[in-house]
Amino acid sequence: MKTTKHCNTLTALSAVTLLLGLSACAGDAQGSSQPSASSTTSASASASSSASPVASATSSASPAASVVAEPKGSEIIEIRAADDTNADAAIAKEAAIAAAKRVVAQDNRLLNAWMHGDFEHTSDEELAKYVYPDTMSQVKEDIQSARNDLKNNGGSFTGNVTMRDVGVSDILTYKYPDGSSHPYSALRVKYCMDWTQVRTPDGERAVTGPDSTATVEVSVMRLQDGRYTYAGTRQINSGCAS
């Protein structure tokens, strides 16, 4: 039996809070400030394991990906697989992997938008399109913390956090509270998070040294209605392999 367990996970906004703390230490990017909070998401992810609570489906599953205009800034879209992922088949696996990578790409885009001061699309209704239910309260707390920190920090950041070497490190089957399960419904996506282009309001690099890049892992959960959602991020280590 294989079980996923993500301890000491950080939402994207926790990374912003950490960055704000680092940049506020008299210009010392290696300051000792810590994120205001972290979220912990534990998920049993095998066909025979018990599951933590998830939201019940509110709409019927749709195998087709939503057709929407390319989102920008803090805009949030629902992410579904482009093919039916209910079957245990190669095409379903590839569709789930692609959906999980889209979740991570959206997470990175939202992180940059929030760092730039764009909080337009942060209502509960909009966040629910993207955030795993157990992670919602933490994301909301971190958004408010980021609002406060940006105000106290003298303005928003410029530049973007970038991603590279994106790959799926685990693909598991999640058993839902009603006893049903879907293959490829719990995924972990690992990548290199690069902060080297991010600048503070005064134009200085926000993070320098070994902490300017980090290897992180994002948990992605498929809900019963077919949506793939962000369920938390954990930092594996400072620096990246490449």
What are the residue ranges of the model-derived segments?
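Core segments of small alpha/beta cavity-forming domains
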Residues: 74-158
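Bacterial signal peptide processing site
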Residues: 26-29
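Hydrophobic helical h-region of N-terminal Sec-dependent signal peptides
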Residues: 14-18
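Extracellular mucin-like PTS domains
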Residues: 35-67
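Bacterial N-terminal signal peptides that target proteins for export
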Residues: 2-13
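C-terminal motif of bacterial Sec signal peptides marking the signal peptidase cleavage site
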Residues: 20-24
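Structured, amphipathic secondary-structure segments that form assembly/contact surfaces
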Residues: 119-242
